[in-house]
Curated annotation (Swiss-Prot):
The active site is at C54 (nucleophile), C57 (nucleophile), C194 (nucleophile), C197 (nucleophile). The gene is pdi-6. It is found in: Endoplasmic reticulum lumen. May function as a chaperone that inhibits aggregation of misfolded proteins. May negatively regulate the unfolded protein response (UPR) through binding to UPR sensors. One of its GO terms (biological process) is response to endoplasmic reticulum stress. Residues 1-18 form the signal peptide. This is Protein disulfide-isomerase A6 homolog. The record marks G55, H56, G195, H196 as: Contributes to redox potential value. GO terms for cellular component: endoplasmic reticulum; endoplasmic reticulum lumen. Residues 139-149 have a biased composition (Low complexity). It is an enzyme of class 5 (isomerase).
Length: 440
């Protein structure tokens, strides 16, 4: 059976059973409720981002449940299944599992929990964060985060209303807030007399509240702020446009989703997921680097590049650029990525039955099952893309890793980014050698 089919079967079972049930004090968090339960809440939260196939996540379950029971009534304990709700972890750069984050007084700046994975240690850290929040409130600081620079004013659609997260946009602030922003924006261009705009207003506000901290929603009165409206050739109302981070006027895209808040949230969440950073392609210079990058991932992609003397810096950088491009295209899969120099890790190559003179080469490994697949096509953009696409669809032949489990990674020097150089040869002094001319 193909590697990915086994994985998908496993995921299908775990997604039904779940690592936590409704009987537990651990709250199941999803794309639909994360914003309202965590970000828009005054409660202190600790949230675990996990994958059902992750061994460390399974080991954490009993201690995490115990911590949730102990903190009941004091703080909230939640969990997000990243195989089902990837966009929730995207804004927080979740790369490995389990990842635990504490959402304290400032929900926009959660802190990483890196302590021991025991109920006592988890509870202690959450209580410490709760104490900070209490001190901040006693000192007159707000427990939430305001939408500074939102351009609030007397506009009818955004700004100063209580609980209204829709940003009022104008000719004066549009460029600074939207076009020069690192945030994702959805902007509604409306007219005060437009009936469809009035119908959309409560849905737009609800979506803005749900998406707070992930995607920003704005509204611009196109009958007043005509400079911006004309730039985007607004002719009908409402018109909704999407702006990715760092967009220019020409980069604006039309929104093509539904007009219920749930439709808007789902559409925007998908775009947020697309904008999550691609996983880094690490050089496998030691055991720790490889395990950190791969062990808790569904799959790990290994690239074996030619020796630096056979493929100098420009050549190698071209290969690395190609790998980074593919990691971007397949980032939603949350795979790990490793590259090593050919022949630098003979035990690893032997386990995969690659190497020798066959560089470059690529394999994909499931650490849990010790199953791998090998790229049989060309090591080029199209060949690699086809190989990875087949893996993501559950296609391709797999083999069992040779030997007794994953081999030990030899410690090597990190590549300095420079061309390789042949070792200098020692000059041989022939002056002391007396050769008879007749011997020449």
């Amino acid at each position: 059976m193909a590697l990915i089919k086994l994985l998908l079967a496993s995921l299908a079972i775990t997604s039904v059973c779940g690592m936590y049930s409704k009987k537990d004090d651990v709250v199941e968090l999803t794309e639909a409720n994360f914003q309202s339960k965590v970000i828009n809440s005054d409660d202190i939260w600790i949230v675990e981002f996990y994958a059902p196939w992750c061994g460390h996540c399974k080991s954490l379950v009993p201690e995490y449940k115990k911590a949730a029971s102990a903190l009941k009534g004091v703080a909230k304990v939640g969990a997000v299944d990243m195989t089902q709700h990837q966009s929730v972890g995207g804004p927080y750069n979740v790369q490995g599992f389990p990842t635990l984050k504490i959402f304290g007084a400032d929900k926009k700046k959660p802190t990483d929990y890196n302590g021991q994975r025991t109920a006592q240690a988890i509870a202690d850290s959450v209580l410490a964060e709760a104490k900070k929040a209490v001190s901040a409130r006693l000192g007159g600081k707000s427990s939430g985060s305001s939408s500074s620079g939102s351009g609030s004013g007397s506009g009818k659609r955004g700004g100063g209303g209580s609980g209204n997260e829709v940003v009022e946009l104008t000719d004066a602030n549009f460029e600074d807030l939207v076009l020069n922003s690192k945030d994702i924006w959805l902007v509604e261009f409306f007219a005060p007399w437009c009936g469809h705009c009035k119908s959309l207003e409560p849905q737009w506000k609800a979506a803005a509240s749900e998406l707070k901290g992930k995607v920003r929603l704005g509204a611009l009165d196109a009958t007043v702020h005509t400079v911006v409206a004309n730039k985007f050739a607004i002719r009908g109302f409402p018109t909704i446009k999407y702006f990715a981070p760092g967009s220019d006027v020409s980069d604006a895209q039309d929104y093509d989703g539904g007009r219920q808040s749930s439709d808007i949230v789902a559409w925007a969440s998908a775009r947020a997921q697309e904008n999550m950073p691609a996983p880094e392609v690490f050089e496998g210079i030691n055991q720790q680097v490889v395990e950190d990058a791969c062990k808790e991932k569904q799959l790990c992609i290994f690239a074996f590049l030619p020796h630096i003397l056979d493929c100098q810096s420009e050549c190698r950088n071209n290969y690395l650029a190609m790998l980074k491009e593919q990691s971007e295209k397949f980032k939603k899969n949350l795979w790990g990525w490793i590259w090593v120099e050919g022949a630098a890790q003979p035990a690893l190559e032997e386990s995969f039955e690659v190497g020798g003179f066959g560089y470059p080469a690529m394999t994909a490994l499931n650490f849990r099952k010790n199953k791998y697949a090998v790229l049989k096509g060309s090591f080029g953009k199209d060949g690699i893309h086809e190989f990875l696409r087949d893996l993501s669809y559950g296609k391709g032949r797999t083999s069992s890793l040779r030997g007794d489990g994953f081999p030990k990674i030899q410690k090597t020097e990190k590549w300095d980014g420079k061309d390789g150089a042949l070792p200098a040869e020692d000059d041989i002094d022939l002056s002391d050698i007396d050769l008879d001319k007749t011997e020449l």
